[in-house]
Amino acid sequence: GRIGRLVARVALQRDDVELVAVNDPFISTDYMTYMFKYDSVHGQWKHHELKVKDEKTLLFGEKSVRVFGIRNPEEIPWAEAGADFVVESTGVFTDKDKAAAHLKGGAKKVVISAPSKDAPMFVVGVNEKEYKPEYDIVSNASCTTNCLAPLAKVINDRFGIVEGLMTTVHSLTATQKTVDGPSMKDWRGGRATSFNIIPSSTGAAKAVGKVLPALNGKLTGMAFRVPTVDVSVVDLTVRLEKEASYDDIKAAIKEESEGKLKGILGFTEDDVVSTDFVGDSRSSIFDAKAGIALSKNFVKLVSWYDNEWGYSSRVIDLICHMASVA
């Protein structure tokens, strides 16, 4: 899917990780090449010439990447391809038992690119230091949790969060419908994406309590799916323990964005809109002009994220962190 392809794009642009193999049981190698090369959101791939060497090998410039088309994860020969880390981005194998099938093929670690009900969840910049080498299967949480958690961490560390509600205004994704169609578990989710604002559930705010235990039970939220193809925005409305002016809050976020959270949390005072963040690799970019305070204890904070590119960048960051700890 899109995250798998974009994780591959991110990996190929970085020196600290090597892409050695991809698995997709549903498409041919030449179609895989086409899907990788042309992207309606992120544009054409321009970094290496991409060629099909044969049906089991892609060439990115001189670099060869093995291609598998195996449906059952335990049959994929990851070890033979030299893969240490597998990114499980099908959206199907999101619990530990299912994702563990990759280990049977010789992978050493599996990173699930979705929230997981039972795998340890990590948000880079927030709790990745709690990763231990004995964890073989981990989750990179969701794109929205990756946007919300760094912001919530800064606010909670500096001012304390009594409680909060989050809304994400979220671009459409592949699970939605182009025209009205059946969606048994989520009736609204079956409505046409291109001209509806669709209220939806999200576990992203509650999941912050898993990566930041101090906030467990203090946050919840919902989503509106809107007809944009990429980039989403979190609205976090919180009650603060310590009184703070909006300028105090801005200053704290700016300081963290230039310090420990540089590259993860951004800060802007420009008059930005969503397309300004297409291709932004940061998890969360605080929009200082969009937020507003009602009082010294009650404030609405707004933060943007490229829910595809930013998230895919964090998948690779998490892998690099895991490798450094091993």
Swiss-Prot record:
It is found in: Cytoplasm. GO terms for molecular function: glyceraldehyde-3-phosphate dehydrogenase (NAD+) (phosphorylating) activity; NAD binding; NADP binding. GO terms for cellular component: cytosol. Pfam families: Gp_dh_C, Gp_dh_N. PANTHER family: GLYCERALDEHYDE 3-PHOSPHATE DEHYDROGENASE, GLYCERALDEHYDE-3-PHOSPHATE DEHYDROGENASE GAPC1, CYTOSOLIC-RELATED. GO terms for biological process: glucose metabolic process; glycolytic process. It comes from the Eukaryota. Plants contain two types of GAPDH: cytosolic forms which participate in glycolysis and chloroplast forms which participate in photosynthesis. All the forms are encoded by distinct genes. The active site is at C143. D-glyceraldehyde 3-phosphate binds at S142, C143, T144, T173, T202, G203, R225. Its EC number is 1.2.1.12. This is Glyceraldehyde-3-phosphate dehydrogenase, cytosolic. The record marks H170 as: Activates thiol group during catalysis. NAD(+) binds at R2, I3, D24, R71, N307. Key enzyme in glycolysis that catalyzes the first step of the pathway by converting D-glyceraldehyde 3-phosphate (G3P) into 3-phospho-D-glyceroyl phosphate. Essential for the maintenance of cellular ATP levels and carbohydrate metabolism. It catalyses: D-glyceraldehyde 3-phosphate + phosphate + NAD(+) = (2R)-3-phospho-glyceroyl phosphate + NADH + H(+). Keywords: Cytoplasm, Glycolysis, NAD, Oxidoreductase. It comes from Nicotiana tabacum.
